[in-house]
From Swiss-Prot:
<dbReference type="GO" id="GO:0019134">
    <property type="term" value="F:glucosamine-1-phosphate N-acetyltransferase activity"/>
</dbReference>
<dbReference type="GO" id="GO:0000902">
    <property type="term" value="P:cell morphogenesis"/>
</dbReference>
<protein>
    <recommendedName>
        <fullName>Bifunctional protein GlmU</fullName>
        <ecNumber>2.7.7.23</ecNumber>
        <ecNumber>2.3.1.157</ecNumber>
    </recommendedName>
</protein>
<dbReference type="GO" id="GO:0031470">
    <property type="term" value="C:carboxysome"/>
</dbReference>
<feature type="region of interest" description="N-acetyltransferase">
    <location>
        <begin position="248"/>
        <end position="453"/>
    </location>
</feature>
<feature type="binding site">
    <location>
        <begin position="382"/>
        <end position="383"/>
    </location>
    <ligand>
        <name>acetyl-CoA</name>
    </ligand>
</feature>
<feature type="binding site">
    <location>
        <position position="155"/>
    </location>
    <ligand>
        <name>UDP-N-acetyl-alpha-D-glucosamine</name>
    </ligand>
</feature>
<feature type="region of interest" description="Linker">
    <location>
        <begin position="227"/>
        <end position="247"/>
    </location>
</feature>
<feature type="binding site">
    <location>
        <position position="21"/>
    </location>
    <ligand>
        <name>UDP-N-acetyl-alpha-D-glucosamine</name>
    </ligand>
</feature>
<feature type="binding site">
    <location>
        <position position="329"/>
    </location>
    <ligand>
        <name>UDP-N-acetyl-alpha-D-glucosamine</name>
    </ligand>
</feature>
<keyword id="KW-0133">Cell shape</keyword>
<keyword id="KW-0963">Cytoplasm</keyword>
<keyword id="KW-0511">Multifunctional enzyme</keyword>
<feature type="binding site">
    <location>
        <position position="73"/>
    </location>
    <ligand>
        <name>UDP-N-acetyl-alpha-D-glucosamine</name>
    </ligand>
</feature>
<dbReference type="GO" id="GO:0003977">
    <property type="term" value="F:UDP-N-acetylglucosamine diphosphorylase activity"/>
</dbReference>
<keyword id="KW-0961">Cell wall biogenesis/degradation</keyword>
<dbReference type="GO" id="GO:0009252">
    <property type="term" value="P:peptidoglycan biosynthetic process"/>
</dbReference>
Length: 453
């Protein structure tokens, strides 16, 4: 069994934001969301989040995560002080405690498993994660014997010139035998210039303590400012895109493409340049997305083509073509083998299979049957200034160019709407609807010209 404590109380002053640092977004999740996602892989018995700055906002952001416990750190007096807050919650607990930081989002689940397995296998009082970094400036140096048993953690400012050449650093991620930690935590002193309680002081008082190296030092990157956030995003994108290409996805220009971790791509998907896939999006096999497209929180079927378009909160079935310059938003459902062309906007609309809206149309709050053809310039006038109304269009119905369908409205099956018509009344099956002024032609008519003299 293992319990996990996640330090998430800090304000993050260097972020220069009203948002708690751990709630800043990174590739589809918050920083804290990434930590929780990795933590879940070790199947913890308990997960305790230590909150402080804007704690209610942090709690609210995690409402969908089951089984979390929260404890308040009213004053942020260091990492040791933060872990002291969990003592009342773990009375009688006899197993391991993983201590994680809510602003270290790149830590892989397998690294946590390695840390926990090493801790248990050697029956350590504590096991800490270490990394060999190219530039160790600012990190505490870890001194071990030949068996990776900790001898000392030395803060950067206290290192001798020789010790500064040591590139093995403390990642600030620990696994403790909880009864041992609970015994020494209350004795922790703030004997430093910052008057803070450091968890490293506790580690130096426990025995035996072992260090285990992370395979990739980038995993321990902490986020303290916007530049580090951007760096973490680049690292994360490289991970995601490498995994996608290894799984049979073609990325034409990886450097210009962004993909959230929550996106699912099937084999033989092709992503063109300048395309961005966000949120809980799935792309079916054989689909081609882009160039220049944004897909967000949408489910795209197999063999769909989308170019230069924005699709959000929508479902598109197999074989449909979208774009260029289409906009689908607000719970759109498009059937299979449809055509959504240039400068077409769909909002809260459901289109049946084999329906075409090839160009210059707006359909809002609309439902169509199958085989419908929406002529160029057709719009549904769905808003009366107070509320939205729906338009229902039957199978095989056709609207002529420049038609206005004033909702609420029902067009039956096999209806034809004449070009230029404004339809305000329901139209039964098999009817032609014409609603426009009759053309008048006056022979010999021309405007009087001014006298040039």
């Amino acid at each position: 069994m293992v319990a996990i404590a996640i330090l998430a109380a800090g304000k993050g002053t260097r972020m220069k934001s009203g948002l708690p640092k751990v709630l800043h977004s990174l590739g589809g999740r918050s920083l804290l969301g990434w930590v929780l996602n990795s933590a879940a892989e070790v199947e913890p018995e308990r997960q305790i989040v230590i909150v402080g700055y804007r704690s209610e906002m942090v709690r609210e952001s995690l409402q969908a995560v089951p089984g979390l416990e929260f404890v308040e750190q009213a004053e942020q007096l260091g990492t040791g002080h933060a872990v002291q807050q969990v003592i009342p919650l773990l009375q009688g607990y006899e197993d391991s405690l993983l201590v994680l930081n809510g602003d270290v989002p790149l830590l892989r689940p397998q690294t946590l498993k390695l840390l926990l397995d090493t801790h248990r296998r050697h029956n350590n009082a504590a096991t800490l994660l270490t990394a060999h970094v190219p530039d160790p400036k600012g990190y505490g140096r870890v001194i071990c014997d030949g068996n990776n048993i900790l001898k000392q953690i030395i803060e950067d400012r206290d290192c001798t010139p020789a010790q500064k050449q040591n590139h093995r650093v403390n990642a600030g991620i620990y696994c403790f035998r909880w009864p041992d930690l609970a015994e020494v935590l209350p004795k922790l002193q703030a004997n430093n210039n910052q008057q803070e309680y450091y968890l490293t002081d506790v580690v130096n008082d426990l025995s035996p303590v072992m260090a285990v190296d992370v395979e990739d030092y980038e995993e321990i990157l902490g986020i303290n400012d916007r530049k580090q956030l951007a760096l973490a995003y680049q690292i994360l994108q490289n991970r995601i895109k490498d995994q996608a290409m290894a799984a049979g996805v073609t990325l034409i220009d990886p450097d210009s493409i962004t993909i959230d971790d929550t996106v699912k791509l099937e084999v033989d998907v092709v992503i063109e340049p300048q395309t961005h896939l966000r949120g809980h999006t799935t792309i079916g096999t054989g689909s081609r997305i882009g160039p220049g497209s944004l897909i967000e929180n949408s489910q795209i079927g197999a063999n769909v083509t989308i170019s230069y378009s924005v699709v959000s909160d929508s479902v598109i079935q197999a074989g449909t073509r979208v774009g260029p310059y289409a906009h689908l938003r607000g719970h759109v459902e498009v059937g299979s083998q449809c055509r959504i062309g240039n400068f077409v906007e769909l909002k809260n609309t459901k289109l049946g299979d084999r329906t075409n809206a090839a160009h210059l149309a707006y359909l809002g709050d609309t439902t169509t049957g199958t085989g419908v053809n929406i002529g160029a310039g057709t719009i549904t006038a769905n808003y009366d200034g107070v509320k939205k109304h729906r338009t229902q269009i039957g199978d095989r119905t056709k609207t002529g160019s420049n038609s206005v369908l004033v909702a609420p409205l029902i067009l039956g099956n096999d209806v034809t709407v004449a070009a230029g018509s404004t339809i305000t009344e329901n139209v039964p099956d098999d009817c032609l609807a014409v609603a426009r002024s009759r053309q008048v032609v006056k022979p010999g008519w021309r405007l009087k010209q001014p006298d040039p003299t």
